[in-house]
């Protein structure tokens, strides 16, 4: 019990979490632009190995020194993975960046890749070695359990995903503002309908900014009243109609629905 409580404090409410040495450039947020280098220091690139090379596949968030939060659909049972931390341009050797192998993967037991709309698209990656925090590598905060963000709450998506449907993958980390769409709206006909569940968050839907292929698993960053950034969402779904489609906001796994699961996995592994 003591161990579980301690982990809950360290992971979900760490005193040093959610603060960046290099503050995000908020003036760049509205149009989906290149992020200020290392301004989202919990953002990681999840990469898989193929023929001796490493390739970006998804994003993720560092939530403890040995643990990364990502989406279950990013994981293949046969894959070999590593994460890149403290990186801005994925194709340039950068001072302060770090590559760490993934030693264990825990996918939520209720995730079903054949029934994606049921949700539970969440996984935890244990790193082979705990990482030291630096000005370029920091922990994300998790939101308090059960938190539901109000309609139009401004959050910010970050990642190395495609800039548009079938578009190119960027070299540099991108960022963009997404407004939360409440469940009542997002689950209505003409929006996502019954695809959306209460264990998800919708954000965007303006036809301009959204997540796209390669952003999956990455954070939906929302600022708390104390100024710290909390990861409220994990990139999960976009519309088959395209990445930037009206009334089809990006869908994220709602992290505040899984605090107990996250703490339990870390405590027992």
From Swiss-Prot:
Residues 17-28 form a propeptide. Residues 1-16 form the signal peptide. Its EC number is 3.4.21.71. Residues 29-267 form the Peptidase S1 domain. It is found in: Secreted. InterPro entries: Peptidase_S1_Elastase_sf, Peptidase_S1_PA, Peptidase_S1_PA_chymotrypsin, Peptidase_S1A, Trypsin_dom, TRYPSIN_HIS, TRYPSIN_SER. Gene3D superfamilies: Trypsin-like serine proteases (2.40.10.10). GO terms for molecular function: serine-type endopeptidase activity. Disulfide bonds join 58-74, 155-222, 186-202, 212-243. Keywords: Disulfide bond, Hydrolase, Protease, Secreted, Serine protease, Signal, Zymogen. Belongs to the peptidase S1 family. Elastase subfamily. This is Chymotrypsin-like elastase family member 2B. It comes from Homo sapiens (Human). The gene is CELA2B.
């Amino acid at each position: 019990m003591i161990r579980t409580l301690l982990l809950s404090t360290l992971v979900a409410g760490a005193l040093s979490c959610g603060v960046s040495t290099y503050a995000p450039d908020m003036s760049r947020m509205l149009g989906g632009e290149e992020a200020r280098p290392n301004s989202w220091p919990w953002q990681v690139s999840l990469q898989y190995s193929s023929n001796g090379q490493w390739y970006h596949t998804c994003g993720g968030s560092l939530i403890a020194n040995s643990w990364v939060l990502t989406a279950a659909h990013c994981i293949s049972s046969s894959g070999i993975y590593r994460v890149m931390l403290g990186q801005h341009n994925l194709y340039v050797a950068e001072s302060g960046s770090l590559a760490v192998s993934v030693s264990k993967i825990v996918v939520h037991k209720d995730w079903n890749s054949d029934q994606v709309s049921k949700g539970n698209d969440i996984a935890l990656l244990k790193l082979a070695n705990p990482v030291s925090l630096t000005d370029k590598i920091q922990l994300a905060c998790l939101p308090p359990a059960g938190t539901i963000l109000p309609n139009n709450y401004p959050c910010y998506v970050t990642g190395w995903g495609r800039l548009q449907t079938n578009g190119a993958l960027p070299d540099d980390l991108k960022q963009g503002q997404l407004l939360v769409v409440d469940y009542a709206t997002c689950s209505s006909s003409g929006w996502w309908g019954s695809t959306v569940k209460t264990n998800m968050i919708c954000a965007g839907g303006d036809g301009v900014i959204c997540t796209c292929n390669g952003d999956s698993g990455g954070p939906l960053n929302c600022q708390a009243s104390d100024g710290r950034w909390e990861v409220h969402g994990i990139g999960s779904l976009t519309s088959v109609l395209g990445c930037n489609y009206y009334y089809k906001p990006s869908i994220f796994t709602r992290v505040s629905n899984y605090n107990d699961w996250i703490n339990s996995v870390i405590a027992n592994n």
